[in-house]
A protein has these predicted regions:
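Short intrinsically disordered coil segments
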Residues: 38-42, 244-249, 339-341
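A broadly tuned preference for mixed-charge, low-complexity surface segments
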Residues: 73, 134-145, 194-199, 231, ...
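Surface-exposed loop/edge segments in extracytoplasmic proteins
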Residues: 95, 238-239, 332-336
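Long, acidic serine/threonine- and proline-rich intrinsically disordered regions
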Residues: 1, 260-430
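Exposed acidic/Ser/Thr-rich ligand/metal-binding surfaces
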Residues: 5-228, 312-314, 416-430
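Short, solvent-exposed coil/turn linker segments
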Residues: 62, 99-102, 158, 243-246, ...
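Intrinsically disordered, low-complexity coil segments
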Residues: 8-12, 52-60, 235-237, 294-298, ...
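Acidic, polar loop-rich interaction surfaces within structured domains
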Residues: 136, 140, 157-173, 179-329
Length: 430
């Protein structure tokens, strides 16, 4: 885990000082493809709604065409020891080919090309069929991938039990790659509460290929389970807020000297219950992250956790002690201790120990402004007062938002969102 810290003036109240701790989880497998053999059972949604474009507001390629293209590239890029089974589903489910190696699957590429979409959606049938196609596999790395727009309006009550059985009894993990912004994310969130399962939402034409081809080996191999971070309670500070910055389009600089997960592992713990600690973050499963090298620096794709600290007395700067717990894939439990001190930043205004935390705080204020849009309109706050807040936030982002993006396309998108809030402030809420 990598720690960073910051002290800033509240951008809306210069008399108020804020302290932040930033956390980024890292592992020794980040940026490295795991080359163990992988058995995949893929279920492809061919319901009628898959004929729609991925974004209902555009006239781009249909979801089914994008899915088939990504599936073809996935097959062409798998390792020689990997195996894939494919079933298609609408109201019913049908196996296109059983668990097969790369060479055998090539004979079925033309069949995939000719798949058409029609009918309704039954995810329970799809999952049942996907399980049947992989249940006899002896490989320890077994995963089902559901490629679907998740528009199952009448999900079977047995689906939740089937998911639990798949993961906990059969040791088969599930990945959902949903297509479109109107997907049933509540169902996906439920499935992802099971260990080893994860969920990705494709809302752009390039997303399916990104998840299923470029990042296949990052999203299919869990590193650890029951991951949590605790902070030691202290009378000298209070936790004001915990902010999870999980923007898919953000990457954060990695300090190569920071100790990664599963490196220099401490001995297994006997009892990890400690009532003097407060849980600040929990994740059912941890997966490796993609790394990007830009101008000689290494950036990690993934999320930043911000802890907003309120000091009881500005003259007392306590150590902030944290503890990380996790269970490895073999069931062994581990913990690691971390500590960070605020003394060296107490007299500095707008101090950031690295660009990760300045970017994270920028996004925190950006999110605050977007949420404030509706609240201000509801409370009939004058537009001029709202615009003042937006301008302050834009100035902060322009100065402190840093990413690997040379063209600043991501930052410019956020700034455009803020401008749109001002432009649409006078219009009624739909």
């Amino acid at each position: 885990m990598e720690l960073s810290k910051a002290s800033i003036e509240n951008i809306f109240n210069k008399n108020e000082k804020e302290y932040y701790i930033g956390l980024i989880c890292k592992s020794k497998y980040d940026g490295e493809e795991i080359n163990e053999p992988l058995d995949l059972s893929i279920a492809l949604d061919i319901s009628g709604s898959m004929n729609c474009p991925i974004n209902m507001m555009t006239d781009g390629k249909s979801r089914i065409e994008l899915a088939k293209n990504a599936l073809n590239k996935l097959i062409l890029n798998i390792k020689k020891d990997d195996k894939i089974a494919l079933n298609i589903f609408n109201d019913e489910s049908k196996t296109i080919f059983p668990l097969s190696n790369k060479e055998s699957i090539f004979n079925n590429l033309e069949i995939i090309k000719n798949i058409k979409a029609n009918g309704g959606t039954n995810l329970t049938n799809a999952l049942n069929n996907a399980i049947e196609n992989i249940i006899e596999s002896k490989n320890k790395n077994k995963r089902i991938i559901l490629i679907t727009d998740m528009l199952d309006n009448n999900p079977d009550i047995n689906l939740s039990n089937l998911v639990k059985k798949c993961v906990n009894e059969l040791n088969i993990y599930i990945t959902i790659v949903s297509i479109g912004s109107e997907s049933n994310t509540s169902l996906a969130d439920y499935i992802c509460k099971e260990k080893g399962c994860n969920y990705f939402n494709a809302i752009e034409d390039t997303d399916l290929e990104y998840f299923l081809v470029k990042n296949l080996r990052y999203i299919t191999f869990p590193l650890s389970f029951d991951f949590r971070i605790e902070i030691e309670k202290n009378d000298n500070f209070n936790i004001e807020e915990i902010i999870g910055i999980k923007k898919e389009d953000n990457q954060y600089y990695i300090n190569q000297n920071a100790p990664p997960l599963n490196n220099n592992i401490p001995p297994p713990i006997i009892n990890d219950n400690n009532n003097i600690n407060e849980i600040i973050f929990e994740e059912n499963s941890i997966f490796p992250s993609e790394l990007t090298i830009k101008n000689g620096e290494i950036y990690q794709k993934g999320g930043l956790i911000l802890i907003k600290i309120k000091l009881v007395n500005e003259n007392i700067k306590p150590d902030i002690n944290l503890k990380m717990f996790y269970t490895d894939i073999d069931g062994e439990k581990y913990n690691q201790n971390y500590s960070i001190n605020l003394n060296d930043i107490s007299n500095n205004l707008n101090y950031f120990s690295n660009e990760n935390i300045s970017t994270g705080i920028s996004l925190y204020y950006y999110g605050f402004i977007l949420k404030d849009f509706y609240k201000n309109k509801k409370d009939n706050i004058e537009k001029s007062k709202y615009i003042e807040k937006v301008d302050v936030c834009k100035n902060f982002m322009n100065k402190y938002y840093k990413t690997y993006d040379d063209k600043n396309e991501i930052k410019n998108k956020y700034l455009k969102d803020l401008n749109d809030c001002c432009n649409f402030y006078d219009k009624p809420i739909q």
